[in-house]
């Protein structure tokens, strides 16, 4: 009986150690779009001729003292739970100081444009696995105050909601720290929230990340996606060949061909490995949509001698162009 008990204790220790050492997703805490709109911190962005409203991070962090405090408090809370954190403020500063900002790409020969919104660029640069969108509103209730909050965990690649919660803190003195009020509120649902994040990350390891891939043909390209090529005595359209490549390169062949025409192909729910080996230095690195797109582009270049361009839109989407870069 004693041996059985010792064996069970040993197994429990091994299991607990393995769980504690399991890799956790990298997190970046970002104010929710609703917060920016409600507080008037927005700006217009020209997305390929379409005017869209995007957050004005610079002005918000410069003029609003609460936003940096609340974002930092949430980041500290998650860091205390063992999650690696990407600092939003430092990432914004780094992007601002880059000499060559990639706000849009213009085709070298044809003048085609592929635009990336500021938030897409932020996600691609930060490479966090999960974005924590934090919306909060500090309200006065007579001589006291309370904080309304909405916390959502978003997969940075697929933009799907993983976990979340919303609520209102208890009424506290106006002198009480907003940090303390927020963290005490989050404690009430912490376990289920974090379990949702860890379960999602475990699913990614087993089934791969989810991304989207779009292929375009420029008018300058002599062939289109319906052009036929001979393989082992049979003829297949280029679209069918690309489709077969996706079956090879995805995790257990998991992807969906949403649409296909002579000039455009759109794949979604594309499951790619979390990690890949860099072909240049042989080292393991995180896989994103851009890296996956380059794999497909290299096949097009090698097999059909095409001019191919690869442009990321955030972490989870990539555009591949044939006939121009």
What annotation goes with each model-predicted range?
Residues 22-24, 65, 69, 73, ...:
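Extracytoplasmic
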Residues 130-176, 315-325:
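Amphipathic beta-strand/beta-sheet edge segments enriched in Tyr/Trp
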Residues 43-126, 131, 235-303:
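N-terminal segment of the mature soluble domain
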């Amino acid at each position: 009986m004693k041996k059985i008990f010792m064996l069970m204790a040993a197994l429990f220790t091994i299991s607990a150690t393995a769980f504690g050492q399991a890799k956790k997703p990298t997190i970046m805490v970002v104010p929710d779009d609703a917060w920016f709109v409600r507080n008037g911190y927005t700006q217009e962005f020209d997305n390929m001729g379409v005017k869209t409203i995007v957050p004005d991070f610079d002005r918000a962090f410069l003029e609003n003292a609460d936003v940096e405090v609340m974002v930092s408090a949430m980041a500290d809370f998650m860091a205390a739970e063992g999650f690696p954190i990407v600092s939003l403020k430092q990432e914004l500063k780094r992007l601002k100081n880059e000499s060559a900002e990639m706000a849009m790409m213009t085709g070298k020969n044809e003048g085609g444009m592929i635009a990336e919104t500021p938030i897409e660029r932020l996600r691609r640069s930060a490479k966090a696995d999960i974005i924590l969108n934090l919306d909060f509103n500090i309200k006065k209730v007579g001589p006291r105050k309370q904080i309304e909050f909405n916390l959502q965990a978003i997969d940075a690649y697929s933009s799907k909601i993983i976990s979340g919660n919303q609520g209102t803190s208890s009424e506290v003195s106006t002198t009480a720290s907003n940090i303390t009020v927020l963290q005490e509120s989050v404690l009430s649902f912490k376990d289920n929230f974090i379990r949702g994040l860890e379960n999602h990350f475990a699913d990614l390891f087993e089934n791969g990340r989810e991304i989207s891939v779009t292929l375009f043909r420029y008018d300058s390209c002599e062939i289109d996606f319906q052009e036929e090529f001979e393989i082992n005595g049979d003829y297949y359209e280029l679209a069918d060949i690309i489709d077969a490549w996706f079956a090879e390169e995805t995790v257990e062949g998991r992807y969906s061909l949403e649409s296909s025409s002579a000039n455009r192909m759109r794949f979604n729910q594309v499951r790619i490995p979390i990690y890949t080996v860099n072909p240049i230095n042989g080292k393991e690195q995180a896989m994103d949509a851009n890296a996956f797109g380059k794999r497909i582009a290299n096949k097009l270049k090698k097999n059909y001698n095409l001019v191919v361009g690869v442009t990321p839109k955030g972490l989870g989407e990539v555009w591949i162009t044939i006939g121009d870069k």
